[in-house]
Regions:
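Intrinsically disordered, low-complexity repeat regions of secreted/extracellular protein precursors
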Residues: 150, 168, 173, 208, ...
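Repeated scaffold domains used in trafficking and secretory/extracellular systems
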Residues: 159-160, 194-195, 232, 270, ...
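Conserved core positions of repeat-based scaffolds
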Residues: 130-133, 142, 168-171, 180, ...
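Charged, amphipathic alpha-helical regulatory modules used
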Residues: 1-110
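Short glycine/serine- and acidic-residue-enriched loop/turn motifs that recur at repeat junctions
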Residues: 125-130, 134, 144-155, 182-192, ...
Length: 389
């Protein structure tokens, strides 16, 4: 992190009459020249050197700050020979002081994105598909197949997260309890200390505040055998398997494993997970993605992905969100579910059977792919995932 004291010293010049303004490079150069301190000699020298290059014009015009930072680090090294152990931190401060914008680290981006990932979900099977969205006021909207009442969420209130299964939808309430719509019969979890929920084909998985996992419902493949799991911080239910992320970055999995989708024992430094049908994917701390399972179809391109902050494994494709708000995808595109090339400013993504769902920063939702059941008809949705005063 940038040294707080030094950052405050540099920012003092940006305060006039109690109101914060953003500096021009010339004014910042004068300030740095007049405020040299021995303990900040290295920082001042580096910043002054950067301000004397043409790199400032890129900071001034940059739309994607994270990409601009990487570009400038390389340019400063290759073209100007400017290298410092704190180069990245100093550039971050230039963005903050000159543009008034903070460049988030991958870890910060992932933490911010995580709550938005819980605001959209897609349930699917061979006979139907539906999309669910959580509105800012705690209400839930749903569109698509409703043969079992899975879209009957109109009366829900105080919801903080949603998850969709093939014929049912789950909402996590503010008090830590669950509410279910659709054809689950007597399948219910009555605990009130739940922090996350994920739905499989016929099973419900819930993460408790104590790091334990409850899983009930169909267990023909052992997908509910989570009783021995401990220190779990994230969960994901696939069609017939369940995956859990431990606090130490390792991953546990149980259930259907004919394609090797549960072979995650060797995974390390994982920060997020997603279970699909024949594969499981995880994000590593460095922003790359790892996969287990049927790699022939769904893993072929992900080894080149970088700066990933969210990932979702579908039935026959995988979709991921980059730190810059763009979306990458790999796998089958038979129904156009991979047509995300022009997507920008997204804050959450989900993969379904033949669909990809994306939540934009403005609170709208876009769905591409098959629309046989009307699951793409989200054009009227507003304020999904946003905070409203």
């Amino acid at each position: 992190m940038i040294q707080t004291e030094y950052a405050n010293i540099v920012k003092k010049i940006a305060i006039e009459n109690g109101k914060e303004i953003f500096l021009e490079p010339k004014k910042l150069k004068a300030f740095l020249s007049d405020h040299t301190k021995n303990e900040y000699k290295e920082e001042n020298a580096f910043l002054l050197s950067v301000l004397n290059t043409d790199c400032i014009k890129y900071i001034d015009k940059a739309e994607n700050l994270a990409e601009c930072r990487q570009f400038l680090l390389k340019r400063l090294n290759d073209e100007y020979g400017l290298v410092s152990a704190k180069s990245s931190e100093m550039l971050d401060m230039l963005f903050l002081v000159l543009r008034g914008k903070k460049v988030e680290s991958l870890d910060e981006s992932r933490k911010n994105i995580a709550r938005f990932q819980m605001c959209i979900s897609i349930g699917y099977n061979a006979e139907g598909s539906h999309v669910v969205g959580l509105k800012a006021v705690g209400k839930v909207v749903a569109v698509g197949s409703n043969d079992s009442g899975q879209c009957n969420t109109q009366q829900w209130r105080n919801i903080v997260a949603v998850s969709a299964g093939p014929r049912f939808t789950a909402g996590l309430k503010l008090d830590g309890s669950l509410i279910i719509a659709g054809g689950t019969g007597s399948v219910q979890i009555n605990a009130k200390d739940i922090t996350a929920v994920s739905l499989g084909n016929s099973h419900i998985v819930a993460l408790r505040t104590d790091g334990l996992v409850e899983a009930i419902g169909g267990n023909n493949y052992g997908q509910c055998d989570t009783q021995r799991w401990r220190d779990i911080v994230a969960i994901s239910a696939g069609i017939f398997h369940t995956v859990g992320l431990r606090g130490d970055g390792t991953v546990v999995a149980t259930g259907y494993n004919d394609y090797g989708q549960c072979e995650t024992r060797q995974w390390r430094d994982i920060v997020d997970i997603s279970a699909g049908f024949c594969h499981t994917v995880g994000i590593k701390a460095n922003g790359t993605v790892i996969a287990a399972g049927d790699k022939a179809k769904w893993h072929c391109q992900i080894q080149h992905w970088e700066d990933i902050v969210a990932v979702s494994a579908g039935m026959v494709h995988t979709v991921a969100l980059k730190a810059d708000g763009t979306v990458v995808v790999s796998g089958s595109n038979d129904f156009g579910q991979c047509n995300v090339q022009g997507w920008r400013d997204y804050i959450a993504v989900r993969a379904g059977l033949f669909n990809t769902v994306g939540l934009k920063a403005d609170g709208t939702v876009v769905v591409c792919g098959d629309n046989k059941f009307g699951q793409c008809n989200t054009q009227s949705w507003r304020d999904i995932g946003l905070t409203v005063d």
